[in-house]
């Protein structure tokens, strides 16, 4: 299992937020966290780093009582493929 850290604008794996081996970049609004981009280095690819980043971000979102909007294709796919994240997904009004 990788060690995931929370930075000011991302959850990341590595020694620093400015030079991560993997990262999930987000922007924060009042009640909405938008996942902008996920990047995993070749060194960590295939080890579930992206999923671990998402799990940590979702746990933080739950603790903060916020919701997630995903712009990032990876995060969007992971968030909607099971019910695991249903409680943190923001549903746009019709």
State where each predicted segment sits:
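Short, hydrophobic/aliphatic alpha-helical segments
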Residues: 36, 55-61
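Conserved acetyl-CoA-binding loop-helix of GNAT-fold acetyltransferases
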Residues: 46-57
């Amino acid at each position: 299992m990788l060690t995931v850290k929370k930075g000011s604008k991302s959850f990341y794996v590595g020694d620093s937020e400015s030079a991560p081996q993997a990262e999930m970049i987000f922007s924060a609004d009042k009640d909405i966290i938008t996942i902008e981009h996920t990047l995993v280095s070749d060194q960590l690819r295939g080890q579930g780093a992206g999923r671990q980043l998402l799990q940590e971000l979702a746990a933080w979102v739950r603790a903060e009582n916020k919701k997630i909007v995903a712009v990032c294709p990876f995060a969007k796919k992971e968030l909607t493929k099971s019910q695991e994240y249903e409680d943190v997904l923001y549903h746009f009004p019709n």
